[in-house]
Amino acid sequence: MHPTPPTAQPAPLHKGAAALSHPVHLRVNGTDHALHIEPWVSLLDLLRDRLNLTCTKKGCDHGQCGACTVLVDGERVLSCLTLGVMRDGCDVTTVEGLASLSLPASATQQDAGAAVPASATSSAPQAAVATLPLHPLQQAFMQHDAFQCGYCTPGQLCSAVGLINEGEARTVDEVRELMSGNLCRCGAYPQITAAVCQVALGIDHARSRTAHERVTTGTVPA
């Protein structure tokens, strides 16, 4: 009798990081990247530590604050909860690449990319703003002063672009609800809502509020 061959056993895991890395191909902000990453590396850490795209912020690192929001194939995702190896072959856009995007044809909008009105700023800053290659939402955020410390702004912008791509926001209240996953510690929610509404809905919400809707100083809207 011939002895029964031993059952094939999986190769033992090596301690070296190279043995655990996986090839990943990503297109990030229009540039193709061929990477080898460990299976536990989040998309957030990949972007910040491997590609040096540090505008995407690490806030809570638990998917609760929205600061790490990026666009993957046009959809907003929390990059701190997304493993890099699971996005192999995807198209990723961070805030650094927003200027290269165009708005969906279905989105009704004002010309948020136009220069800021003279009443809002002096002529010199206005000229500088007008020449910057910015996405309409970035222009609207500047026009409405929709940031203070700016830490949450990259995630707010990417989330707002994703909101427009989804095409589900039809009212100001729906914009508020669909942006509620992005927190602003400085409390700039009225300005953020106004900026997103200008581009997504084509209305100047900051000027169209009724007296009842106006925000009382020292409060944060729901």
Name what the model sees in each region.
Residues M1-A222:
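Signature of N-terminal electron-transfer/Fe-S-associated modules in redox systems
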